[in-house]
């Protein structure tokens, strides 16, 4: 049985780790390389760096942070933010990323996903989907894709987009609920489940973790293969070890360090 992965997420702005509420109100949470080393030592299964300035301020992804992290850490590293071209993917992989996250560029041109997957292998291409519920309380649930750090609505249905990019070669989908991000009220389980049921690739649940039970629900109810969280780890509410033990006690298959 494949083991569920716990993935701390480091949102990086101006070279520092930050954590905001619904992509705003950024709060400094430390140095990214030091944070990464701490998570590696704590037994995180993977780590995710998202350069949240890159897409809308046209800044290059933090290659120096990536290379220093890759030198210091053994866990797999996913890096996203401002990835627009095959050359961007190559540069990040050469800097030490194991996987590269594509967001806005995949929405603008899903064929870019196919091109990147063909050149580097689908196992290292992660498409990041930022979605917001647009259906009313009495309507069938529907979510829309947003780009540029959650600023730009696209009119694109999130579940259909997930199908499209998975068919084009995305090896994994990072699904973030913009309604839930930073609220600490739990994942949007309906969104996560709708996408997990629609595709054959692993789905990472993201956005809204407030406690350890939310991680369990992301897998058990949301159908996710991995769970991503930030605040509960960054500010010391829980350790990765506590999260793994809690999820294992709930009957989920976890990689437990001796």
UniProtKB/Swiss-Prot annotation:
Q: Where is the active site?
A: 11, 130
- Assembly with partners or alone: Heterodimer of HisH and HisF.
Q: Major location, coarse class? A: cytoplasm
Q: Which family does it belong to?
A: Belongs to the HisA/HisF family.
Q: What class of enzyme is it?
A: lyase
Biological process annotations from GO: L-histidine biosynthetic process
Name of the protein: Imidazole glycerol phosphate synthase subunit HisF
Q: Which reaction does it catalyse?
A: 5-[(5-phospho-1-deoxy-D-ribulos-1-ylimino)methylamino]-1-(5-phospho-beta-D-ribosyl)imidazole-4-carboxamide + L-glutamine = D-erythro-1-(imidazol-4-yl)glycerol 3-phosphate + 5-amino-1-(5-phospho-beta-D-ribosyl)imidazole-4-carboxamide + L-glutamate + H(+)
Q: In which pathway does it act?
A: Amino-acid biosynthesis; L-histidine biosynthesis; L-histidine from 5-phospho-alpha-D-ribose 1-diphosphate: step 5/9
Gene3D superfamilies membership: Aldolase class I (3.20.20.70)
Q: Which Pfam families match?
A: His_biosynth
Q: Where in the cell is it found?
A: Cytoplasm
Q: Name one GO molecular function term.
A: lyase activity
List the taxonomic lineage: Bacteria, Pseudomonadati, Pseudomonadota, Alphaproteobacteria, Hyphomicrobiales
